[in-house]
Amino acid sequence: MARRISGSVRRGELGFRFGEPLDVDGDGHADIAAGARFKLQQQTLQNGSAAVWSGASGAEIRAWDGEWPGGLFGHWVMPVPDLSGDGLADVVVAAPLAPVDGRTRGILVARSPKTGETIWQHAETESENLGWDLTLAGDHDGDGRTDLFVGAPAGESGRVYLLNGKDGSVLRTYTPREARGSFGWYVARLGDLDGDGRADLAVGAPMAQAADGALVGEAWVLSSASGKELHHWNETDGRRGFGGVLAAVADLDGDGKGEIAVAAPGTEDQARTIPGELRIYSGGTGKELRRWSGSQPGELYARMVIGAGDLDGDGVEDLAIGAPWYRRGTADRVGRVELRSARSGAVLDEWFGDEANCWFGWHIRRAPDPDGHGRPALLVGSLRHPVDGKVSVGVLDLYVLRGPADADGQGIITRDMRRSDIK
């Protein structure tokens, strides 16, 4: 089964980055939140917008327009477990180019879909582009609210913040050992790797610069409690965009600690001559355990990576990997999503976009099974999919995956088996 949320804004690019659906209206169904960060106001200002749709009916529950000129409000839209105390999920929306004191420092705002009101607002004052990436961090201060890791990668070196989910205040700031740039471009929550009982984090800097100015690309694993560097990796070929995407992976080497996926999708390869790569590193030792390459140069393989559940029945969570610029025949940037066994590396299935230039697989997130059967589901974005004759609108498709032992004998669901859409 699949369901579709279609954008409505011409060139709005619905779903640049979105989080796992959560129930915001109390009907027992997980609802979908996403933004169209390029929505125009006053003809030229890319203020952006964000909205929440019912997971049951597809009806729009709440929508907001960005209020900061050119701020890209809706660049990230993250559903978060109850922040306001009303028992319902709320949303955090990023406007990473929102002006503060005349600079594009960025603003993060938490809002209630139930009332539409602002719960808190945090404006960056030190670095720039606050909210370029963010992820749920768990409850680090014991106040019963989910906190957030938030990247602000621009400025001299970039920063990552641990923000209090209740009021948006800063609990901790993470900075790199050296000011090499773009630290915080991507952040990922990991398991507890240093044994202190708290979830740790991975940070990417795909446009870090060496002393001679050359792009290198870096990734770190940090202790969330102390900020101590646990692991560090880099890539000398700056074309690869190493560290542009990170993800937690199941334990593959048997040491009881989860691993880390670091992508090198080739985002800085303007000629599109190199294939993207995904590398899996040990969370315990930092040693490289796996390395997979895309099927063609320039497809942005591993532009998105997410755990997809155990699809092959081997007891290890497998991966969904996006390649949004995949060429299918003569159609460019159709996009594809690859389902790959984390243990064996075997490709279990592939899905493809509808047409040229729809960028299928740009962003992917896990989702609850809308049918309540406990099967893994994925929400997949086609960032530039046309809608009703309008270009670069964007759509989100929800797919329910069938494991290898489903009662009906069918394997992993494919895109061709879509049965219903939400418009």
Tell where the protein language model's regions lie, with residue ranges.
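A generic fold-level signal
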Residues: 13, 27, 45, 72, ...
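Acidic/hydrophobic-patterned starts of short beta strands in beta-sheet-rich repeat architectures
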Residues: 26-35, 85-94, 142-151, 195-204, ...
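Short glycine/acidic-enriched loop and turn motifs that connect beta-strands
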Residues: 38-43, 97-101, 154-157, 207-212, ...
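Surface-exposed coil/turn segments at beta-strand junctions on protein surfaces, enriched
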Residues: 9, 25, 68, 84, ...
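Beta-propeller blade termini
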Residues: 16-26, 75-83, 132-140, 185-195, ...
